[in-house]
């Protein structure tokens, strides 16, 4: 099982990170221990959304989709209430 996930920075609320992994718990720990170049600047991070995929190819495609404008719109609709409460929308 592979996971596509969305992280939110606790130090900069409007900073979101999209990625995919096979081990979601371990990956979150890595992000919070500053082991990822893209996320070490805005630690700590919290998991706000994830989807499970049956294989790596599907997870990678879903991650790429979430990184384009149409995919971002879908995420914003799914997370609308949460993002509104966080004053991001």
Where on the chain are the PLM-derived regions?
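GIY-YIG nuclease catalytic motif and its immediate N-terminal context
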Residues: 1-37, 43, 50, 57-68, ...
């Amino acid at each position: 099982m592979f996971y596509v996930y969305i992280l939110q920075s606790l130090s900069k609320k409007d900073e979101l990170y999209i990625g995919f992994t096979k081990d979601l718990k371990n990956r979150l720990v890595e992000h919070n221990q500053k082991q990822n170049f893209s996320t070490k600047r805005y630690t700590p991070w919290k998991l706000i959304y994830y989807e499970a995929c049956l294989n790596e190819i599907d997870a990678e495609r879903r991650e790429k989709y979430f990184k384009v404008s149409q995919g971002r719109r879908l995420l914003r609709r799914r997370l609308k209430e949460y993002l509104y409460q966080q004053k991001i929308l």
